[in-house]
Amino acid sequence: DKISVTVDSSGDSSGTDGSVYIFEIKPYQNDLSGRTDYLAKGSIGANQKFSFPLHAGPGELRLYSAFVPAVKVGGRYEMIANRRYIENPEIVAENQDPALNPGKKGLRVDPNILDDALSLNIKHAGVDIPTQRFFGNGIDYTYESKTYKINKELIDQLDAEVKRLSDSGVAVTAILLNAWNQTVPELNPLGVTELPKEQAVYYGFNVESEAGFRAVKAMASFLAKRYNGKNGHGKITNWVVGNEINNQYWNYMGDYDVSAYT
């Protein structure tokens, strides 16, 4: 599989080496400082086409990366346009089945009283996944060459809940809630300390560091594969990441103004 990029460049290229370079920018990267690892190189001009592998390494896709053109000035590379993301990531999805949409009636369910919810003939159910409990012990999961330890107690609970609902024809929506994480602190927003519950209940996910980004990806990969409806654990049809993300009480990210926060 390949990623294709088309670049139109013009203007004064004096001071450069006459070439345009394509760089990958990962979510935790902001600029090209000190970098020389460009993906492709071509001539400055109109309708220049580049391609490079979708896979960055074994099992590691570039789906979440952005790509920028740059020129070489002296010994450094400088971006010459805004970053762009892959515009059709859905074509590489393993599961191309249409989403389940059995009706309008739905509830955010309590796992202890599923019978009551099902007796109301619900068609949709919201299931909370507390991500501060996700990592733990009992299940080993290897993702992008790293093995993560996952809390089997939580997964057993989710297995029972999701399977019961989806086997009953209910479309399950999982809501990933990131309370302060003592087990895997890299999931907590950078530069933020835990606040009293009356000030913040949940926190935004940290994808500003490589460790946080990879932990979030590993968690998403495990959950998506386990609850794809094809391996006996039930199916999660929809995913909600965070809660009330425009409100710092429910999705705390630190001391930002509105513009920076959004």
Language-model regions, residue ranges each:
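Acidic/aromatic-lined carbohydrate-recognition and catalytic surfaces
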Residues: 130-154, 167, 171, 177-182, ...
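Beta-strand acidic-aromatic groove motif in beta-rich domains, primarily in extracellular
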Residues: 15-21, 174, 182-189
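Active-site cleft segment of glycoside hydrolase catalytic domains centered on the general acid/base Glu
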Residues: 187-262
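Short, solvent-exposed loop/turn and secondary-structure capping segments
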Residues: 117-119, 136-137, 177, 183-189, ...
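Generic structural signal for well-ordered alpha-helices
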Residues: 113-115, 158-163, 220-224, 262
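Catalytic domains of carbohydrate-active enzymes, especially glycoside hydrolases
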Residues: 104-138, 160-177
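Mature N-terminal, pre-catalytic/accessory segment of carbohydrate-active enzymes
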Residues: 1-112
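Short helix-terminating capping/connector loops at secondary-structure junctions
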Residues: 100, 166-167, 231-236
